[in-house]
Amino acid sequence: MFLTRTEYDRGVNTFSPEGRLFQVEYAIEAIKLGSTAIGLKTKDGVVLAVEKRVTSPLLEPSSVEKIMEIDEHIGCAMSGLIADARTLVEHARVETQNHRFSYGEPMTVESTTQAICDLALRFGEGDEESMSRPFGVSLLIAGHDENGPSLYYTDPSGTFWQCNAKAIGSGSEGADSSLQEQYNKELTLQEAETIALSILKQVMEEKVTPNNVDIAKVSPNYHLYTPAEVEAVIARL
């Protein structure tokens, strides 16, 4: 007896006869509703820029965290469910600190990304199978290690890719095509900031201000821009 489409829909570990995992596909669709995030790798470091959706004037803009530090040499931008992103980031922070404690050296960016994707593939850390579901979040992981600057992109299936530039979220299609036109490997960090913010400006539905965008760079240490620094980048547009 074959299961119906809805029964395949419910299981996160049951393939349909066409070889599809519907819950993972739906999680990937959920990211297309999230805020836009852009990452660009340059020879000096990596720049991340994210749209912050401040849905109410009563909301404190600084409490909307869309870029987080994982270790002093790694940061990540996210699109999708923020609670899911926090779970992955907390896991990555523990992994990087354990590595530093055990081996006396920072964890490489690829190993950190691998640790995040291993958890994404297990759909959580608990043994409570009935509660597990794919993480509805995609991450842009920026870092600087002995191999130089690097940018990785992860999705809910637990897959990751290394990129030179990447956009995720609701405006990702338009942003990706703009990145293809404007990106080159000789960009400076300052040019990368300007490109990332100008592309965000195109895809966002409102005026760009320090309250609704976040920018960070890893070169070689992670640094989240202050509102004044964001204002300075906006002034260059």
Swiss-Prot record:
<comment type="function">
    <text>The proteasome is a multicatalytic proteinase complex which is characterized by its ability to cleave peptides with Arg, Phe, Tyr, Leu, and Glu adjacent to the leaving group at neutral or slightly basic pH. The proteasome has an ATP-dependent proteolytic activity.</text>
</comment>
<keyword id="KW-0647">Proteasome</keyword>
<dbReference type="Pfam" id="PF10584">
    <property type="entry name" value="Proteasome_A_N"/>
</dbReference>
<dbReference type="Pfam" id="PF00227">
    <property type="entry name" value="Proteasome"/>
</dbReference>
<dbReference type="InterPro" id="IPR023332">
    <property type="entry name" value="Proteasome_alpha-type"/>
</dbReference>
<dbReference type="GO" id="GO:0019773">
    <property type="term" value="C:proteasome core complex, alpha-subunit complex"/>
</dbReference>
<protein>
    <recommendedName>
        <fullName>Proteasome subunit alpha type-5</fullName>
    </recommendedName>
</protein>
<dbReference type="InterPro" id="IPR001353">
    <property type="entry name" value="Proteasome_sua/b"/>
</dbReference>
<dbReference type="GO" id="GO:0005737">
    <property type="term" value="C:cytoplasm"/>
</dbReference>
<dbReference type="InterPro" id="IPR033812">
    <property type="entry name" value="Proteasome_alpha_type_5"/>
</dbReference>
<keyword id="KW-0963">Cytoplasm</keyword>
<dbReference type="InterPro" id="IPR050115">
    <property type="entry name" value="Proteasome_alpha"/>
</dbReference>
<dbReference type="GO" id="GO:0005634">
    <property type="term" value="C:nucleus"/>
</dbReference>
<dbReference type="GO" id="GO:0043161">
    <property type="term" value="P:proteasome-mediated ubiquitin-dependent protein catabolic process"/>
</dbReference>
<dbReference type="InterPro" id="IPR029055">
    <property type="entry name" value="Ntn_hydrolases_N"/>
</dbReference>
<comment type="subunit">
    <text>The 26S proteasome consists of a 20S proteasome core and two 19S regulatory subunits. The 20S proteasome core is composed of 28 subunits that are arranged in four stacked rings, resulting in a barrel-shaped structure. The two end rings are each formed by seven alpha subunits, and the two central rings are each formed by seven beta subunits. The catalytic chamber with the active sites is on the inside of the barrel.</text>
</comment>
<dbReference type="InterPro" id="IPR000426">
    <property type="entry name" value="Proteasome_asu_N"/>
</dbReference>
<comment type="similarity">
    <text>Belongs to the peptidase T1A family.</text>
</comment>
<keyword id="KW-0539">Nucleus</keyword>
